[in-house]
């Protein structure tokens, strides 16, 4: 879904005030659900979640955590609900066989790095992860899902967006009141800069929680300087992708923003190719969008891949090690 504009306005906005009673009910029920005890998993679970609806950078964070866990001598597997996919699982994702409409876009990216399991039933998915040889599970999303007991939960926030008007859905972007969500996290991952992000980071530090500051860095070594591009993205905050391209020196001659997890149809592809021909630019998108493109589009679009780099990687590695039993 595309976030409504009033979510980023003050909470006194008329629509926010009208929807606030519903938000209090929704947020309260979600918070009550978060407080329930979860089932014991077959191996430790590290949860990468966020406080709000929509994207915040959870998938790059999950990929980065898997790399740090390997540094610690662990064998991680990813567990995802498979948002946007029709398979309920549990199923091990095979990028050569599965499509985004079956397992979701994020699991396809995760499966390139390690075993990735899609399961609506998280305990069943955890058993499949362990059965595949994993000794630690990185759960992509699931902070508000109590079905599994977690050894460590990290909340990811986008420094440029964060919590909007601070109200629970549908009055705002929060999944539950922030005050009740804090008790379920052991640290914060702050991606990028921004006044809003700094405020939430200060709140985390005031509660004694570590704040792991990070940034998305381009991979692949492509030279974007001076390149005329038509940029499109259907992610949580497409503007961040466009800003990254501009920072790399690309000349964006046209941009198109789609809703997060947008399933690209042939008509979308036809419109994009016509736009690129008209503007004289190369089509470019994100890795997450690329797996949702029609088969005929793959190979005809440049992909900007990014990875998450932490300012204090050693500090995060220490927190991960402390949360896990000795191997």
UniProtKB/Swiss-Prot annotation:
GO cellular component, one term: plasma membrane
Disulfide-bond pairs as recorded: none
A Pfam family hit: LpxK
Enzyme class: transferase
GO BP terms in the entry: lipid A biosynthetic process; lipopolysaccharide core region biosynthetic process
Record keywords: ATP-binding, Kinase, Lipid A biosynthesis, Lipid biosynthesis, Lipid metabolism, Nucleotide-binding, Transferase
Annotated positions binding ATP: 52-59
Keyword Cytoplasm among UniProt keywords: no
Substrates-to-products reaction catalysed: a lipid A disaccharide + ATP = a lipid IVA + ADP + H(+)
EC number of the protein: 2.7.1.130
Gene Ontology MF terms: ATP binding; tetraacyldisaccharide 4'-kinase activity
Stated family: Belongs to the LpxK family.
Protein known as: Tetraacyldisaccharide 4'-kinase
Species the sequence originates in: Methylorubrum populi (strain ATCC BAA-705 / NCIMB 13946 / BJ001) (Methylobacterium populi)
């Amino acid at each position: 879904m595309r976030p409504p504009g009033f979510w980023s306005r003050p909470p006194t906005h008329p629509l926010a005030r009208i929807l606030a009673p519903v938000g209090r009910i929704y947020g309260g029920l979600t918070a009550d659900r978060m407080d329930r005890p979860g089932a014991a998993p077959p191996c430790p679970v590290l949860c990468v979640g966020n406080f709000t609806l929509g994207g915040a950078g959870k998938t790059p964070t999950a990929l980065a955590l898997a790399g740090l866990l390997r540094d610690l001598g662990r064998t991680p597997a990813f567990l995802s609900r498979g948002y946007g996919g029709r398979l309920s699982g549990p199923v091990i994702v095979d990028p050569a066989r599965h499509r985004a409409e079956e397992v979701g876009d994020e699991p396809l990216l995760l499966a390139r790095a390690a075993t990735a399991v899609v399961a609506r039933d998280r305990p069943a998915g955890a058993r499949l992860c362990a059965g595949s040889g994993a000794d630690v599970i990185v759960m992509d999303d699931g902070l508000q899902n109590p079905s599994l007991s977690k050894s460590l939960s990290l909340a990811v926030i986008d420094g440029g967006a964060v919590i909007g008007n601070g109200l629970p859905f549908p009055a705002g972007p929060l999944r539950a009141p922030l005050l009740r969500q804090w008790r379920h996290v052991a640290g914060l991952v702050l991606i990028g800069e921004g006044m809003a992000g700094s405020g939430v980071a200060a709140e985390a530090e005031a509660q004694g929680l570590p704040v792991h500051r990070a940034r998305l860095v381009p991979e692949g070594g492509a030279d974007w300087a001076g390149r005329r591009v038509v940029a499109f993205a259907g992610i949580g905050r497409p503007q961040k992708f466009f800003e990254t391209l501009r920072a790399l020196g690309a000349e964006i001659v046209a941009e198109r923003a789609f809703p997060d997890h947008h399933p690209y149809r042939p008509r979308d592809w036809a419109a994009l190719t016509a736009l690129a021909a008209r503007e004289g630019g190369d089509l470019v998108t994100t890795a997450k969008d690329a797996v949702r493109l029609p088969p005929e589009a793959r190979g005809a679009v440049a992909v900007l891949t990014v990875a998450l780099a932490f300012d204090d990687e050693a500090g995060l590695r220490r927190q991960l090690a402390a949360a896990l039993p000795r191997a």
